């Protein structure tokens, strides 16, 4: 199988650049890593990553974009710079993987999608739950009609982060709704489709004197129900309470926790647990549960990217990604 020659532009402290680079390097049967670039003074801002990248060729952005043998690029800069470099990659005619959801500028995102469409380039975004095996199972079962009419999706993705990371949320409209809530909006949109209205509800807790929107929330209205997402950056124990709950007329599915690391520190692979109930007759019906085999969220994501670069139909179209980005901004009050 032909390897895809790929480079990475950028990394960041609070997103997944180092994990994506590690996945590219480890999946040697899929990728040949040409090198990396650290724009925007990332050497000075993120010295903790130098050792990880040191064995690979340091390049400039211009060297990556002008190298005809490099056919794909992962853009993993800080969020505010994502669309700047993504557009450069697309204009250079290279396939693109980009950290989610992009910089908070709709015109720039529309321009990016237009370039990608015109050049027929692969486009992948870092929405990690798309490749969670239990999420994939849930989406398949919803699509099959097993739950009947769906009237509610609830999704939570919370954590307890440092004062410094909560201050960083000032970079975005809606704070946590933009930063992590976008993962959940992706799930709501896949299951429920186009909402009739979006109600942004993000707030600042003010804890530690930080006045960013560290409590993200949004409600999505539909003709036959309501769905909501919540992403708090101040929730003690929030990681294991991350969930996706889908309620239909015939039954309910709940993935909780959405991810769990059962073997830290020996292994950073995750598992996910599906809970389900289809007993409509018993008031206190018990839920059954099943936990997935261990998986790596980034390996599955980048394997999918390799497949669409090679010509597999992208399950997430350009138009889907654009409309999702618009919904994310609406949920953030923009």
Show where each model-derived region lies.
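C-terminal helix-rich "cap/oligomerization" subdomain common to oxidoreductases
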Residues: 1-3, 9, 37, 72-74, ...
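N-terminal Rossmann-like dinucleotide-binding module
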Residues: 1-52, 306
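Predominantly a Rossmann-like dinucleotide-binding segment in NAD(P)-dependent oxidoreductases
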Residues: 12-13, 129-209
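Active-site loop of classical SDR/Rossmann-like NAD(P)-dependent oxidoreductases
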Residues: 41, 237, 289-303
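Beta-loop-alpha module in the N-terminal Rossmann-like domain of NAD(P)-dependent dehydrogenases
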Residues: 53-115
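Rossmann-fold dehydrogenase core element
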Residues: 111-129, 149-153
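Contiguous beta-strand/loop segments that form the cofactor/metal-binding neighborhood of enzyme cores
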Residues: 179, 186-262, 302-312
């Amino acid at each position: 199988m032909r390897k895809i020659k790929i480079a990475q532009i950028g990394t960041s402290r609070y997103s997944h650049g180092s994990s994506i680079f590690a996945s590219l390097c480890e999946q040697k049967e899929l990728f040949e890593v040409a090198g990396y670039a650290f724009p925007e003074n990332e050497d000075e801002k993120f010295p903790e990553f130098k050792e990880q990248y040191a064995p690979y060729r340091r390049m400039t952005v211009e060297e990556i974009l002008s190298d005809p043998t490099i056919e794909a690029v992962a853009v993993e800069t800080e969020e505010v710079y994502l669309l700047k470099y993504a557009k450069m990659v697309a204009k250079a005619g290279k396939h693109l993987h980009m950290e989610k959801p992009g910089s908070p500028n709709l015109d720039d995102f529309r321009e990016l999608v237009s370039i990608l469409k015109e050049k027929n380039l692969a486009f992948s975004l870092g929405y990690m739950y798309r490749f969670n095996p239990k999420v994939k199972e849930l989406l398949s079962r919803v699509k099959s009609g097993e739950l009947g009419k769906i009237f509610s999706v609830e999704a939570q993705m919370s954590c307890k982060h440092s004062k410094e990371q909560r201050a960083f949320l000032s970079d975005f409209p809606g704070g946590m709704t933009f930063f992590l809530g976008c993962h959940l909006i992706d799930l709501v949109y896949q299951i429920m489709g186009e909402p009739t209205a979006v109600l942004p509800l993000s707030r600042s807790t003010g804890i530690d004197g930080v006045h960013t929107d560290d409590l993200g929330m949004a409600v999505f209205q539909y003709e036959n129900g309501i769905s909501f997402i919540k992403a708090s950056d101040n929730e003690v124990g929030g990681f294991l309470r991350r969930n996706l709950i889908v309620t239909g007329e015939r039954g309910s599915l709940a993935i909780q926790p959405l991810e769990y690391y059962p073997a830290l520190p020996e292994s950073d692979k995750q598992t996910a647990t599906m809970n389900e109930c289809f007993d409509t007759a018993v008031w206190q019906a018990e839920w059954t549960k099943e936990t997935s085999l261990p998986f790596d969220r980034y390996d599955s994501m980048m394997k999918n990217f390799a497949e669409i670069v090679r010509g597999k139909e992208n399950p997430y179209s350009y138009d889907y990604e654009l409309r999702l980005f618009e919904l994310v901004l609406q949920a953030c009050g923009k």
